Amino acid sequence: MGIVVIGAVFVDIKGYPLSTYIPGGRNAGRVEQVHGGVSRNVAEDIANVELRPTFVGLVDDTGMGLDVIEKLNNHKVNTRFIQRVPDGMGTWLAIFNNDGDVCAAISKRPDTTPLIRLLEEQGNEIFRDCDSIALELDLEKETVKQTLRYAKKYGKKVYAVVSNMSIAMERRDFLQQIDCFVCNQQEAGLLFSDDYGHLEPEEMCRVLAANVRSANIPCMVVTMGDKGAVYAQADGDCGIVPAKKVDVIDTTGAGDAFFAGTVIGLTYGKTLAESCEIGSRLAASVICITENVCPRFRPLEFGLDVPVVD
């Protein structure tokens, strides 16, 4: 059944200035509304590498909810386990500056408690034959527990990402059961109660290696924007993955694409360094387009011997 992705769906409302952005002032520009959410983006990114993921999540019981399901279906994502419920989708409102970076954002999270019952009733069917699990860590605590129980039952690897680190901090103890956790530099600072914003990759790599050992986290990757990413494992292996040099149009979804690429690599036999390299390529492909997901690739472009199933 491919990689199972579990998480929330958002509607992204994005504003772009037509001239020089004035913080605190009125800015003429354009406003776009697109399907978003970390996990939804990750599922579509995986599908765009001609793999066939399964998305487990919720959408609104409205026309917009149907649109989300239809788009995922068009990208060959298995949507059998998406439920339509009231308040099933969140909203993310973001303002971008002239460099394509988010300068202000606010989000309304959806009610994801119906996922608990969904996993109770269909968890065995969802996880039994999957290749691995990609989990949004800031879901309901019970949903995270259920997922980890099924992963242990069926011997599946679990890879985690966050959309709200403040909420994910309440699930910090679960990181010891996660095969690889991916977050950005700011989120890593919150996780370890420190400020890493001034660190260069070499120093960040050393700090991360020490932290994963002391916190007993099996594996962790920290993205650092245009400085690339660093990774570290509890066994002492660590390294740096340089960023790809591309012209920035819109950074939305770059972190999600990096996570998707890393999960793809780790699931289908690549080393952690090779997997992060796939993530870096997918992230670069998102940054230089207006979409918040990567364009189409084939597995062989990343050295993956995975059959493409139509």
Roles of regions detected by a PLM:
Residues K71-P86:
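A glycine-rich helix N-cap at a beta->alpha junction
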Residues S132-R206, K227-G228:
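Conserved beta-alpha-beta core of the PfkB/ribokinase-like small-molecule kinase fold
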Residues I3, D194, H198-D310:
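Conserved phosphate-binding/catalytic region of the ribokinase-like
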Residues E125-I126, D173-F174, R213:
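Structural alpha-helical scaffold elements that stabilize or flank donor/cofactor-binding regions
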Residues R84, A94-S132, L137:
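Conserved phosphate-binding/catalytic loop of the ribokinase/pfkB sugar-kinase fold
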